[in-house]
Amino acid sequence: MITIEDLKPTPGSNKKYKRLGRGQGSGKGKTAGKGHKGQKSRGTGKVRAWMEGGQTPLHRRLPKFGFKNFTKKFYAVVNLETLEEKFDSNAVVTPEVLIEKGIIDKIYDGVKILARGEITKPLTVKAHKFSEKAKEKIEKVGGKIEVI
């Protein structure tokens, strides 16, 4: 059985710390293992990750491109298959009802209805935008569309 007194560190795992810059006799005196001159021998001695010496840095060699369109609208998207699953016949679907049922978390700049999946129930759908196919499918089964 092993007891706590029997435990010893693995050989080589406890290496004694070498004090630097304490005279030539120590083996790490004078320059303390930093060599002669240069940025890395100085006080802070740090070279930033993006520093490339005199070479033009990568972020300046690469061309600029793109921008953030601040007028872009972001719509909460709902597919017909979701409406089919979550609503009964002749129900009125509004953005507020979609939030209540947990289908969308926010209205953002509006709600857009897309046509993925099939719909068999006639629903009254009120939204900010509809895809052409979604309009066709909703009206085909006797539903109504209202653009808010």
From Swiss-Prot:
Quaternary structure and partners: Part of the 50S ribosomal subunit.
Record's protein name: Large ribosomal subunit protein uL15
Cited NCBIfam families: rplO_bact
InterPro entries in the cross-refs: Ribosomal_uL15, Ribosomal_uL15/eL18, Ribosomal_uL15/eL18_sf, Ribosomal_uL15_bac-type, Ribosomal_uL15_CS
Keyword set includes Transcription regulation: no
GO molecular-function term, one example from the UniProt record: rRNA binding
UniProt keyword annotation of rRNA-binding present: yes
GO cellular component labels: cytosolic large ribosomal subunit
Domain of life: Bacteria
Bias kind Basic residues: ranges: 31-45
Biological source species: Fervidobacterium nodosum (strain ATCC 35602 / DSM 5306 / Rt17-B1)
GO biological process terms, semicolon-separated: translation
Family under the similarity heading: Belongs to the universal ribosomal protein uL15 family.
Alphabetical keyword list: Ribonucleoprotein, Ribosomal protein, RNA-binding, rRNA-binding
Chain intervals for the UniProt region annotation (Disordered): 1-46
Job of this protein: Binds to the 23S rRNA.
Gene transcribed to yield this protein: rplO
